[in-house]
Every structure is written in structure tokens, then in C-alpha cells.
Curated annotation (Swiss-Prot):
Protein name: Kelch-like protein 6
Gene name per UniProt: Klhl6
Residue stretches making up the BACK domain: 172-274
Knockout-associated phenotype: Mice show impaired antigen-dependent germinal center formation and B-cell antigen receptor (BCR) signaling. The number of mature B-cells is reduced.
SMART domains reported in the protein's UniProt record: BACK, BTB, Kelch
Organism: Mus musculus
Database matches in Gene3D superfamilies: 1.25.40.420, Kelch-type beta propeller (2.120.10.80), Potassium Channel Kv1.1, Chain A (3.30.710.10)
Keywords for the protein's UniProt record, in alphabetical order: Kelch repeat, Repeat
């Protein structure tokens, strides 16, 4: 079984073997291409026809379709499938055991198959004879269960990979249950990891309350559990116990030991934990309460598994101000990380290639593009760094160079969609371009996607619900456009949507809640676009123009950084738009004005902190 799981499919072997021309040769380097011929002596040759396996496979499928030479009929529901015993036995250990041992099915012409429907059986038989199977959202569970039953292990793995890619907060518990039922350990581990990373979005689902105790235990004990405060973990445990209180109250002590009670706010611990009726009637948890009390009373001197903060409690959501240009046209190498909640600044690594002793050797990062994918920051292009692409790893605080762009550019944008990075449009030094490149992080390679409808630079771009949006920009050096271009990766096509209220370039956009917010250029306003309604609205007026400013969401608010006003003076203020209060306020003042910079949001380990005071001129 292990050997089957790791083996290549027949079609894989054929594809590789047919890559080169067919030739009769004694060159050993070519022995793996086409039809292989090795001269052993002057009188002997060894012939290896690598195409024969494909011919056999196609021939067997044709025989099945024509019902020729079949020797067994599989009866599923009311449908019958004529097959060849030898093919079934060769492909599946289940059928090998059935036909090669002294079982009654070995001698029967018609065999009734239970536990699978006819449509799924047809899918498995097509796979058996062709090594191909169509897996969809509608059939993946049935195909997985049947493949597991008949021991088509590679098909099981394919279904598991499909489910892993389809994970979301609504279906992950169901997929976890499926993995547990069929002992799919690898899939189970991946789903548990997904739940740990998306804990807050998942814990409110009804299915979460049905988790078995061992699974809940594994999730809650993880250091990587993604919560902002331990109170969320405590409340989850109590909700889970109350859901089936009569049978779960006895499990409270073992589950509660995974809650880091010492890290709770002392007021919350007294008012919400110690006062909870279920806690009070369960003496077995009292030692855990005592540990938390002593931790608070001793000045945090007690050390245990429950006094160690989770990884995400060391992190904070921050927005980064990356590079750019100052009032005297000096290029900024620093990356400023601001935490609005804690009013603090985090020091991070300077931009790459900017720390040479000679100033003339340093790269000048300006009019580049940046985006965040999986908490890593990607930057690309720029006037002096046209083909360069780097990513910032926040866990090690370093920039790492990755594969170059195929087409160098600046005044472009980067957007993340479907786990890939898109580089859109821009200026190549001669003209505005409509080229779109897509980066695959797994293979570290770029490929082309459908080009933009309109060649633009200095535009705004973002992704929203499985589509890309390119807004405004300059089709040439003098003009601006109001066009909204929308890309659907499922069709690889661009279409035009409702135009912006004004023509604008040197603008930026961000997807936030149900809208796309656009700011910058000469607009003196913050606009919002609704992809659902395909309509625009004015959000709020600005006191000045903010051409080439940055915008980023952070802690459920929007932050507008820097830019240039109508006098071409750089701006140092950071504005905050609060959607709940519908209010625009000044958050703080940067050490220096900056424009043409990047602005993104990440979660950053909370180390090397310096204070930022509202209205201060430096940090």
C-alpha cells in the first residue's frame, strides 16, 4: 500500500517519456527519451517501448466501453458496469483480495457493490482504466469515501488536496469530521492547522460546538492559536461545555487546563471566571484557579505551560510605511511600522540594497509596488529596481530576493488573489503597459495573465471577492482616466465596470469590509466603490490633495499616510477613517513627509518598541 501511494500514475510516466524525439541511439544520456534502445553487444539490442503502457491503458478502456472480453459485472444500485477482473485487481488491493482469494466473488459473474452510488462508481472505473478523475465540490466527499473503501490511495490523496484548497470557516469542521472518520491523518492535521489559524472566525459556528473533546483539546493547547486575548479561549470552552452540559461537565477540568488562565485580565478572572456557576460547581478546576491567583499575586513569577503567551499574543496588527520620497527628493530606505492601538513604533529591516557604506551604491526605492501575502510583504519594480522582486519575512525580519519580473516597470501595482501575486500595468520607461504577470510562491516563477483593457500607470488596484480591480490611472503623461477595470481569473478576462466619479491618477485603493476605498491624486476626497452594486459614493472630503499617498486597513479602520498636496509639498500627517463613527481624524505626524511610498498591513512580533505620540514630529 505504501508503495502504491508514492508511485507515479501511468500517464505521468508516459508524459515524461514522450518529451524528447524518438531515436535509435547508443548514447546513454538519451536512453530515457522515447523508445529506448541499448546495444548490449554487436548482436543484441535491448528495446524498451515506453509508449506501450499508454497503448495498453487506452486499449483496455476501449474494451470496457465496447463490453469486449469483460468477465465480471459490478451491480451498483440499478446500474451495471461490465469490467475486467484483472484490471480491477491490478489497480485496487480491495479487488485483488476479492478476486485472488478463495471468496465467493471470485467465481461470481455478477457482484453487488454496496456503500457507493452508481455515479461515483463510474468515476472510479474511469479512473481505474484511464488514471483520470473529475473531482468537484459536489462529488469530492463521495469520491473520497469510495476511493478509500476500494483503496485507490492516490485518488484519496487527490481528494484530500482538493478539500484542503477548499477550506473555509463554514466547511472546515465538516471536513475535519470526514478526515477523522476515514483516518486521513494528513488531511486532519491540515484542517486542524487551518482552525488554529482562523480560530476567531470559526468558533461561532454551531458545528464547532460538536467537536469531540480530543480535537478541541489539541486545538486549544496550541501555541499558534490565533486569538488576540485569552478570554476568547475561556469563553469558547464554557460555550462548548454548556452545549451538552450533562455529559460534558465532567470534561471541564481537562479542557480548561488548556486555557491560560494566568494571562487573563485580573478583573475578568474574578468577575467572569471565578464567578461562573459551572466553574463554582466543579472542584476539580480549583487548582487551575489557584495557579492563576498566585500568578497575579506573585508578580508573574510562577512559570507553567499556562503562563506562556501564545504566539499571536506577542503580535500586533500594524501598518507599514515603506520607502518613498521626501520633500527634498531624498529617497527613504527605512520601513516605519506603526501600531495604532498601542501608539507605538516597531523597528524593522531597511529596504534591500540600501545599507552600503557608499551612498552612491545604495538602491533608491521609489514608485515601486507592494502587497502582503500570508503575512509576508512583497515589493517589486521601481525606477531604479525595475525587475527586482523581494519579500519581507516578518518572523526573521529580513528581505529575501525572489524571481525577477519578466518585464521591468514602475508606477505599477501589486495585488494578491487566490494565493498568487499579480503585478499590473505601469510604465517601462518608454510607454504605459498593459502587461499582467502572476507570481506562484510555491514554484517561485512568473507567468502572464490577460492584459489590461487600458494601458495605465499610477492607478489604484486591489482584490475583492475573487476578482481584481484596476481603477483610474494615467494612460499617458498628461491625462487621467476614470475607468474601472475588473479581472476574473476563472475566465482570464477583463471587463469595464462603473467609472469613478472623477478622472484621477497617483491614487491608491484598498478592499475594506464590503467596499473598495480609493484616495489620492487631485481628488481631495475618499471615495468608495461597491462591487456588489457596481456603484460609487463619496465617503468624506479631505482638506488637501494627497497625490501618491498610501492607504491601509488596520484594526478595523483605514489609515491614509503621506502624499503630496496641491503645492507639491510632501505631507507628514497620518489620517484615520473610522467607519463606525463615520469620522476622519488626524492620527499622528510622521518623522518626515513622504510620498510615492508603499503602505500595507501585517501582524508583527512586538519587539524593539518606540513610542509614537499623536501630533509628535518624530518617533
Amino acid at each position: 500500500m505504501a508503495g502504491q501511494r508514492g508511485a507515479c500514475t501511468m500517464s505521468d510516466v508516459v508524459e515524461r517519456s514522450l518529451e524528447g524525439p524518438l531515436a535509435l541511439t547508443t548514447d546513454k544520456s538519451s536512453q530515457k527519451r522515447g523508445d529506448l534502445v541499448e546495444i548490449l553487444t554487436g548482436e543484441k539490442v535491448k528495446f524498451d517501448d515506453t509508449r506501450l503502457s499508454l497503448i495498453l491503458q487506452n486499449g483496455l478502456e476501449t474494451l470496457r466501453e465496447e463490453n469486449a472480453l469483460t468477465d465480471v459485472i459490478l451491480c451498483v444500485d440499478v446500474q451495471e458496469f461490465s469490467c475486467h477482473r484483472v484490471v480491477l485487481a491490478a489497480a485496487s488491493n480491495y479487488f485483488r483480495a476479492m478476486f485472488c482469494n478463495d471468496l465467493k466473488e471470485k467465481y461470481e459473474k455478477r457482484i453487488i457493490i454496496k456503500g457507493v452510488d452508481a455515479e461515483t462508481m463510474h468515476t472510479l472505473l474511469v479512473y481505474t482504466y484511464t488514471s483520470k478523475a473529475l473531482i468537484t465540490k459536489q462529488n469530492v466527499q463521495r469520491v473520497l469515501e469510495a476511493a478509500n473503501l476500494f483503496q485507490f490511495l492516490q485518488l484519496v490523496d487527490a481528494c484530500a488536496s482538493f478539500l484542503t484548497e477548499a477550506l473555509n470557516p463554514e466547511n472546515c469542521i465538516g471536513i475535519l469530521r470526514l478526515a477523522d472518520t476515514h483516518s486521513l491523518d494528513s488531511l486532519k492535521m491540515q484542517v486542524q492547522s487551518y482552525i488554529i489559524q482562523n480560530f476567531v472566525q470559526i468558533l461561532n459556528s454551531e458545528e464547532f460546538l460538536e467537536l469531540p473533546v480530543d480535537t478541541l483539546y489539541h486545538i486549544l493547547r496550541s501555541d499558534d492559536l490565533c486569538v488576540t486575548e485569552e478570554a476568547q479561549v475561556f469563553e469558547t470552552v464554557m460555550s462548548w461545555v454548556r452545549h451538552k452540559q450533562s455529559e460534558r461537565l465532567c470534561l471541564l477540568p481537562c479542557v480548561l487546563e488548556n486555557v491560560r488562565l494566568p494571562l487573563l485580565d485580573p478583573w475578568y478572572f474574578v468577575e467572569m471566571v471565578e464567578a461562573d456557576p459551572l466553574i463554582r460547581q466543579c472542584p476539580e478546576v480549583f487548582p487551575l484557579l489557584q495557579e492563576a491567583r498566585m500568578y497575579h499575586l506573585s508578580g508573574n513569577e510562577i512559570i507553567s505551560e499556562r503562563t506562556k503567551p501564545r504566539m499571536h499574543e506577542f503580535q500586533s496588527e500594524v501598518f507599514m510605511i515603506i520607502g518613498g520620497c521626501t520633500k527634498d527628493e531624498r529617497f527613504v530606505a527605512e520601513v516605519t511600522c506603526l501600531d495604532p492601538l498601542r501608539r507605538s513604533r516597531l523597528e524593522v529591516a531597511k529596504l534591500p540594497l540600501t545599507e552600503h557604506e557608499l551612498e552612491s551604491e545604495n538602491k533608491k526605492w521609489v514608485e515601486f509596488a507592494c502587497v502582503t501575502l500570508k503575512n509576508e510583504v512583497y515589493i517589486s519594480g521601481g525606477k531604479e529596481t525595475q525587475h527586482d522582486v523581494w519579500k519581507y519575512n516578518s518572523s526573521i525580519n529580513k528581505w529575501i530576493q525572489i524571481e525577477y519580473l519578466n518585464i521591468g516597470r514602475w508606477r505599477h501595482k501589486m495585488v494578491v488573489l487566490g494565493g498568487k501575486v499579480y503585478v499590473l500595468g505601469g510604465f517601462d520607461g518608454l510607454q504605459r503597459i498593459n502587461n499582467v504577470e502572476t507570481y506562484d510562491p510555491f514554484h517561485n516563477c512568473w507567468s502572464e495573465a490577460a492584459p489590461l483593457h487600458v494601458h495605465v500607470s499610477s492607478f489604484a488596484a486591489t482584490s475583492h471577492k475573487k476578482k481584481l480591480y484596476v481603477i483610474g490611472g494615467g494612460p499617458n503623461g498628461k491625462l487621467a482616466t476614470d475607468k474601472t477595470q475588473c479581472y476574473d481569473p476563472s475566465t482570464n478576462k477583463w471587463v469595464l465596470k462603473s467609472a469613478m466619479p472623477v478622472e484621477a491618477k497617483c491614487i491608491n485603493a484598498v478592499s475594506f469590509q464590503d467596499h473598495i476605498y480609493v484616495v489620492g491624486g487631485a481628488m481631495r476626497a475618499l471615495y468608495a466603490y461597491s462591487p456588489l452594486e457596481d456603484s460609487w459614493c463619496l465617503v468624506t472630503q479631505l482638506s488637501h490633495e494627497r497625490a501618491s499617498c498610501g492607504i491601509a486597513p488596520c484594526n478595523n479602520k483605514l489609515y491614509i499616510t503621506g502624499g503630496r498636496d496641491e503645492k507639491n509639498e510632501v505631507i507628514a500627517t497620518v489620517l484615520c477613517w473610522d467607519p463606525e463613527a463615520q469620522k476622519l481624524t488626524e492620527e499622528c505626524v510622521l518623522p518626515r513627509g513622504v510620498s510615492h511610498h508603499g503602505s500595507v498591513t501585517i501582524r508583527k512580533s512586538y519587539t524593539h518598541i518606540r513610542r509614537v505620540v499623536p501630533g509628535a514630529v518624530s518617533v
